[in-house]
Design a protein with these regions (language model features):
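Conserved phosphate-binding elements of NTP-dependent enzyme cores
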Residues: 1-654
């Protein structure tokens, strides 16, 4: 758009603009005036553009030009090295590094559309435009450096050597870059690639990333709140994390941490213990003071749990010749041609420092490979050579932390399969028989039942707010009890169907003590430390750990099953109090006791000590990981000087 300088247009401050000054218009190249060229170079700081009638542009520079071909490069600034800016990003993939194409399978109504992701054919995943891709510092390009792990990049940057004027410019930048990379390494993120998408980071990794940023900011007088920052962190690295939290305190800030990790609890200046239990039985400060004061307080559940040695599960032996699931040549991501042996019918823990390849080995290679062998629906497994010994296995599944439902209609009682049984209990009551109610009357998910017609059995109403989050309020007709008045009039032990949905799992165990099929999954849920969950709590409000424990309870009480199942769990201790970890280990042991195989990714010392077989990956994270450093019974691993071996030795008092 050409405008006159006498009446320039108003430009948005937040938008990016390219502004060129027109020096002259010429009919043909031979008519170029020397004075116009000199004027353009003067106003353009040594650069000028030539635009043809077709709209194509060519840049000419007196400072950044190739003497052989004449190709000119504009003056570079940091924006050129960002794939989020117009000049820096690759035009083909718009800075994503990948191309997305739709593929159709089938025809008509049965057609399914898949989005296929492939590497960008122009930048080959670098995400940058040709000019920034060509710039090198000490022989390395920008996208090559950001493709390294934090530890590798730190080592590379420290090796840079500059001289003369370049050293004067580079020195302060390199010092700050090294400082920030060291902060990332110190909080246990040395294995992360610098260009890794933030959306793929775990909650613990994201917290530690923010912590590293705060360490670099050097603020004083701030209040920092962290929720379980040790999630995903190997015990070996907890000390470094605590050291960095202490640095924030030394700077004059206050650090408030919600945490179950024993080392973090003992390192605190002031400890607040809430309880005495969870849910309705919690919410009270039962003890506070120094860790020593709280841990010697008999009223403190945390103090009681730490005052005694945990009761370790009796490990099952793995004799020579025991049936094994053998995976060889796993080489996905950072795995280095890994071979593992998984004893069937045993409790196996896969441990290792953060980024050593645990999740890649178990969730991206082993589980999909087994499911593929069993002809079950699965993602394509990661690279491996062979898989043997799957014959006894009939099922393979991951008991993960994904949501079990996304609406108020899905509740723990329906997920565990006990609401149908409870409906029959109500239908068998004298009041229900007099009124002619059958079990369907007590369903809040069917229109023909006795559900509240105002909220359709959801117990709440959602109000859409323009430009604001939706507001959820209790239904004014049923008061959140999901049923209409006549249905609520039917009672069992003085409780209506709505009252039963408001019970916690612990309370429901005593109410339905004469109904074993109802009590069994609820008791298992209590054993898993989730007895505070109410039967009618919306599944979409459950945390990942709570959803995982509900899935475990459902699997353990699914009835008689003669199918050997391979279960995979990823850090099931997340969010668990130290007193509940012991319960978890014994409940997991029940799966093994009935003949199933359990593979758990975990580095909680108590869980590792309670396993039958331990596989340790390492020795470090990222490129320095991906190898088997120890494999065998926990007592054997504890004798090795590996990261996990040292922790296990202390836990098992060897």
């Amino acid at each position: 758009v050409r405008v006159y300088t006498e009446s320039p247009p108003k430009l948005k401050k937040t938008a990016e603009h390219t502004i060129d000054l027109v020096i002259g218009v010429f009919d043909e190249a031979s008519s170029f005036e020397r004075a116009a060229i000199e004027k353009a170079l003067h106003w353009g700081d040594g650069e000028l553009k030539l635009r043809t009638e077709t709209g194509s542009e060519q840049l000419f520079s007196t400072t950044s030009a190739c003497p052989k071909c004449g190709f000119s490069v504009p003056e570079l600034d940091p924006r050129w090295f960002s794939f989020n800016t117009k000049q820096g990003r690759c035009e083909t993939c718009e800075g994503h590094g990948v191309l997305h194409e739709e593929e159709r399978e089938g025809r008509g109504k049965n057609a399914q559309v898949y989005v296929v992701e492939s590497e960008c054919t122009e930048c080959h995943g670098a995400r940058l435009a040709p000019i920034p891709r060509a710039v090198r510092v000490s022989g390395e390009r920008y996208h090559e450096l950001t493709g390294r792990s934090v530890t590798s990049a730190l080592s590379r940057v420290k090796s840079w050597k500059f001289s003369g004027d370049t050293a004067l410019v580079a020195r302060p930048v390199v010092i700050e870059l090294v400082r920030r990379l060291e902060f990332l390494d110190e909080v246990g993120l040395g294995y992360l690639a610098l260009d890794r998408a933030a959306s793929t980071l775990s909650g613990g990794e994201m917290q530690r990333l923010r912590l590293a940023a705060q360490l670099g900011a050097g603020l004083t007088g701030a209040l920092y709140v962290l929720d379980e920052p040790t999630i995903g962190l190997h015990p070996r690295d907890t000390g470094r994390l605590l050291g960095n939290l202490r640095r924030l305190v030394d700077l004059g800030s206050t650090v408030l941490v919600v945490e179950h990790d024993i080392d973090t609890i003992r390192a605190a200046d002031h400890l607040v213990d809430l309880g005495p239990s969870g849910g309705a039985n919690g919410g009270h400060v039962v003890a506070q003071g120094s860790p020593r004061q709280v841990l010697t307080n008999v009223a403190s559940p945390t103090g009681r749990a730490l005052a005694r040695a945990p009761e370790q599960r009796a490990a099952l032996p793995v004799p020579r010749g025991h049936a094994m699931l053998e995976l060889t040549g796993a080489s996905e991501h950072n795995l280095k041609n890994v071979d593992i042996s998984v004893p069937l019918g045993r409790f196996i823990v896969v441990a290792g420092v953060s980024g050593s390849g645990k999740s890649t080995l178990v969730r991206q290679v082993l589980l999909p490979a087994v499911r593929q062998k069993l002809k079950l629906v699965t993602d394509e497994p990661g690279a491996f050579s062979t898989l043997r010994g799957t014959e006894p296995v009939m099922r393979a599944l991951s008991v993960d932390q994904s949501p079990i439902g996304r609406t108020p209609r899905s509740v723990p009682a329906t997920f565990l399969g006990i609401w149908d049984l409870i409906r029959r209990v109500f239908a068998a009551s004298p009041e229900a028989k007099v009124l002619g109610f059958d079990a369907s009357r007590f369903s809040f998910n069917t229109p023909k039942g006795g559900r509240c017609t105002t909220c359709d059995g959801q117990g709440s109403l959602t109000h859409e707010m323009s430009f604001l989050p939706d507001v959820v309020t209790a239904c004014p007709a049923c008061g959140g009890q999901r049923f209409e008045p006549q249905t609520l009039g039917v009672r069992y032990k003085g409780l209506s169907a709505g009252d039963v949905l408001a019970l916690t799992a612990e309370q429901a165990v005593s109410v339905f003590e004469n109904h074993p099929k109802i009590v069994a999954p609820l008791r298992t849920l209590c054993d898993l430390g989730a007895g505070y969950i109410t039967l009618g709590q919306g599944s979409h409000t459950l945390s990942g750990g709570e959803a995982q424990r509900l899935k475990l309870a459902a699997e353990l009480t699914a009835g008689a099953r003669h199918e050997h199942t391979l279960y995979v769990l990823d850090e099931p201790t997340t969010g668990l109090h130290v007193a509940d970890v012991e319960k978890l280990v014994h409940v997991l042991g029940r799966l093994v006791d009935r003949g199933d195989t359990l593979v758990v990714i975990e580095h909680h010392p108590q869980v590792m000590a309670g396993a039958d077989w331990l596989i340790e990956l390492g020795p470090e994270g990222g490129d320095a990981g991906g190898r088997i450093v120890a494999q065998g019974p926990p007592r054997d691993v504890a004798k090795k000087k590996t990261a996990t071996g040292v922790v296990l030795s202390a836990e098992m008092s060897l």
